[in-house]
Amino acid sequence: MPKALIVYGSTTGNTEGVAEAIAKTLNSEGMETTVVNVADVTAPGLAEGYDVVLLGCSTWGDDEIELQEDFVPLYEDLDRAGLKDKKVGVFGCGDSSYTYFCGAVDVIEKKAEELGATLVASSLKIDGEPDSAEVLDWAREVLARV
């Protein structure tokens, strides 16, 4: 059975809800999932033992891209997470009225690629409140590529 690690950073609860919805979909299709708050993990060896790693982070800030506060330490140490040759997907919530809509998703995705990860799906960028159909479709896309 393939295994997925879903790590999320959430301030208002939206990104956490998306992480849980993704896990529910993957579980229902036979994938074993582990969902953890980014505040509860460290980077060294994070991806070890997983077939796919999904990283979820909300975006803050208007004039510059700000990752969700708890996600910053993991992002800064992501080179120690073991993402080389690992399948990775990135998702997050934001507000399209800001200059850098879901900018955190973009910078995490870019760094994962620079570290040798293979993007398993196009990033999922949610504007405001999560749309369950959009999340379901993305989770199924991930599942099809693992």
Swiss-Prot record:
<keyword id="KW-0249">Electron transport</keyword>
<dbReference type="InterPro" id="IPR010087">
    <property type="entry name" value="Flav_short"/>
</dbReference>
<dbReference type="Pfam" id="PF00258">
    <property type="entry name" value="Flavodoxin_1"/>
</dbReference>
<dbReference type="InterPro" id="IPR001094">
    <property type="entry name" value="Flavdoxin-like"/>
</dbReference>
<dbReference type="InterPro" id="IPR008254">
    <property type="entry name" value="Flavodoxin/NO_synth"/>
</dbReference>
<comment type="function">
    <text>Electron-transfer proteins that function in various electron transport systems in microorganisms. Functionally interchangeable with ferredoxin.</text>
</comment>
<dbReference type="GO" id="GO:0009055">
    <property type="term" value="F:electron transfer activity"/>
</dbReference>
<dbReference type="InterPro" id="IPR029039">
    <property type="entry name" value="Flavoprotein-like_sf"/>
</dbReference>
<keyword id="KW-0813">Transport</keyword>
<dbReference type="InterPro" id="IPR050619">
    <property type="entry name" value="Flavodoxin"/>
</dbReference>
<keyword id="KW-0288">FMN</keyword>
<keyword id="KW-0285">Flavoprotein</keyword>
<dbReference type="GO" id="GO:0010181">
    <property type="term" value="F:FMN binding"/>
</dbReference>
<feature type="domain" description="Flavodoxin-like">
    <location>
        <begin position="4"/>
        <end position="143"/>
    </location>
</feature>
<comment type="similarity">
    <text>Belongs to the flavodoxin family.</text>
</comment>
<protein>
    <recommendedName>
        <fullName>Flavodoxin</fullName>
    </recommendedName>
</protein>
<dbReference type="InterPro" id="IPR001226">
    <property type="entry name" value="Flavodoxin_CS"/>
</dbReference>
